[in-house]
Amino acid sequence: MKPVQKMAEANFKANGMPVGILDANNGDILVQVGWQEICTNFHRVHPVSRQRCIESDTHIASMLKVNEVAEYKCGNGLWDIGIPVIVFDNHIANIFLGQFFFEEEKPDRDFFIDQAQKLGFDTEAYLKALQKVPKFSKMSLGLEIPRISPGPFLVFHKN
């Protein structure tokens, strides 16, 4: 996975979009780059919010079909885009682009304050991490998705 990790790092450096690649069978994280502090230091650490992460990953994975892209707002309030990786008709992994916000929406600060308080997070540190979450316009993602959607380099069929 080292070459794929390097490719993901180059992609993140070029456009700032966090990337994760998860095993389609067991959900193991195979590659991750640019994951947000709010996720790595808060959401994926606390048992309640971590369960939301797992449920969100599982839900978006269930939405994926060959040559389709799915967008989903996770239970912790952030967006992910999922892309299936199909090799010889086997769904082996999912590429997750995110976590991010759409520029067209204003993050619900009260939702995040409430979440921090309910889960016992340091509210100031949590909100500071929230401010670091990147924003992408739907238009810019519309331009990016066709270049990285499951095309010939991700979907291989038996001849």
Regions found by a protein language model. Give the residues of each.
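Juxtadomain coupling helices with adjacent low-complexity linkers
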Residues: 1-10, 93-159
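Structured interaction and signal-relay segments at domain junctions
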Residues: 1-77
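Surface-exposed beta-strand edges and their flanking turn/coil or helix-capping segments
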Residues: 34, 43-47, 85-87, 106-112
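A short, hydrophobic, proline-anchored segment that marks a local hinge/packing element in signaling
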Residues: 80-88, 99-100
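A glycine-centered beta-loop-beta connector
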Residues: 26, 86-95
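Generic structural microfeature
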Residues: 14, 21, 84, 141-143
